[in-house]
Amino acid sequence: MSKVSGGGPCSRRRDGVDPALRSRARRRALQAVYAWQISGGVAKQVIAHFAHEQAYEVADLVYFEDLVEGVLTHCAELDEKLTPYLDRTIEEVDAIERAVLRLGAYELLYRQDVPYRVVINEAIMTAKRFGSKYGHTYVNGVLDRAALALRKVEVLG
């Protein structure tokens, strides 16, 4: 019997993407981005540390590396894109929610292969799991408005 989640053949989409593995990659990417935000470490070291741990947890390692490298490389741009939808400065946003928002903004901008609804839903679920009690509602509001600006055709289409 095939596994329905976590890497079984039945869980893959037609394009070969396994949503469960991508979700795990996002959770690990959140941890890596959070660690980078707190420590200010070098991007390659953060990725190497978490990629090593990633090998022990079944996940989409390529997607994990793309997310982390993308957020760390484009952080200033992502913050700029998020700023109009924040009610405070990005630095004042809780560190977990800040990492989730940056990951979501990266996917909205640079991962057009991922539907905006998937980006927002994954961000909400990640914020619920790791963030503050109501952090997921904040993440939802910010990314929902950002998606309208960044992917207007897809959102309104």
From Swiss-Prot:
BP term (GO), one: DNA-templated transcription termination
Cited Gene3D superfamilies: NusB-like (1.10.940.10)
Alphabetized UniProt keyword annotations: RNA-binding, Transcription, Transcription antitermination, Transcription regulation
Keyword match Zinc: no
Record-linked SUPFAM superfamilies: NusB-like
One Pfam family hit: NusB
A GO-annotated cellular component: cytosol
Gene Ontology terms, MF aspect: RNA binding
Function: Involved in transcription antitermination. Required for transcription of ribosomal RNA (rRNA) genes. Binds specifically to the boxA antiterminator sequence of the ribosomal RNA (rrn) operons.
Homology family: Belongs to the NusB family.
Entry protein name: Transcription antitermination protein NusB
Gene name linked to the record: nusB
